[in-house]
């Protein structure tokens, strides 16, 4: 049977889902709303419109055409926001460079992406100076100067400076229509093994992620919401999965936006206070730093809503945030998923639950957002029961998931084996549809034939008074196969012993909450927990150091 395909009139407009369409509403309805960069720069949406056009004209003068890859090395700024729009709207590809990678890895990603133009903030001149002769495809360097940044000696052949280029360019640019499946962005995953892998997204995918997530965030009756009265500040780097796609959402909504530059805790806390920030997103490490810094201790955060992602939200950290009035909750996804798949928003009626139950819901992986087909499956790809007990791998489908890794067909096939994107996260789903990740496939511990969730043990230890941070890893054991080891960072001036931690975890074993195999064999007190370039706990490194 043949499908009856809709036919269009000869004059009908086949509306492509292009990033430029996201600007139609804010440029009319929010012309006078502010976009702020640190304490250095303020502009309106009307000015943003002009600067996007100026950037496109300037890049055109330097040879950027449809399909050209433009790489950016900058802190979170208004310039990055301009690049988010101008570059893909030209039909070019925006590469957001992870500036926390090693120089060799940065060179690899730029070469692998085939970037021809590189925008470089002053702070990264030493890095680019050290790799410029290894950049095989870059033909044009553009300098991003900034007041207060120290200019190091270099021999980089800059063609122009960013603001000078914009000043010399027209405020009029006609952004063309083209296929909505055109690649818009590229960035590189930062796994703990092998070379970084290129992930890419099309205009259609980014528009659908933006609209769907905007609807999901606006839907709660109260709390865990993002609405047009909010003031937005990203605390996830703009080089990392488009800062979770939130700058696109904030711009569509036309809200006041605040870009903090380099993440310095006291500066971030001051911006929250002085600019009235009410909505952000970050990894738990950043939230922990903000709560602990001097400015953070005296800043009223009672109007602040924060999504935590990039790893589990320990209940201890969540409680500390809630005690400060912060409306904190989990968002889940990964680089390959654009990234958001689920949100841990409280359902209607949750206000009747006791504090511990509400805390538990906020720390879950959450419920899938609209259009996401998320399943937990066994090794045969059979879906498991939604009973809150059966655990398997999370696999997903959604219209914004990357279709593969750039120039890596073998890894792409593995990613999409069986027609679903594989996350390598182990989880269960309860009868209400809430997902709860129990571990990463590579981090789960098998002791005495029993599976031990490192995340569950971390969560319990994080609730012990005096614990600042914790990571649990498995080490080899002749008798048990593996045994859990807890690495603990204590709060300043607190006296806690190894036996204190063990007895705390043992109490949950005695009550039947966890297996006795989950009680750490050893507790090591450390000064800090190693992190990856995007702020996640680096368990591979920890295993190498402590196993």
List the predicted regions and their residue ranges:
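Conserved AMP-binding A3 loop
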Residues: 44-46, 184-212
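Gly/Ser/Thr-rich phosphate-binding loop
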Residues: 252, 274-282, 291-360, 373, ...
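Conserved beta-loop-beta connector loops within the AMP-binding
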Residues: 368-395, 429-432, 494-498, 537-538
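Conserved pre-ATP/AMP-binding loop-to-beta segment of ANL
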Residues: 31, 142, 167-188, 195, ...
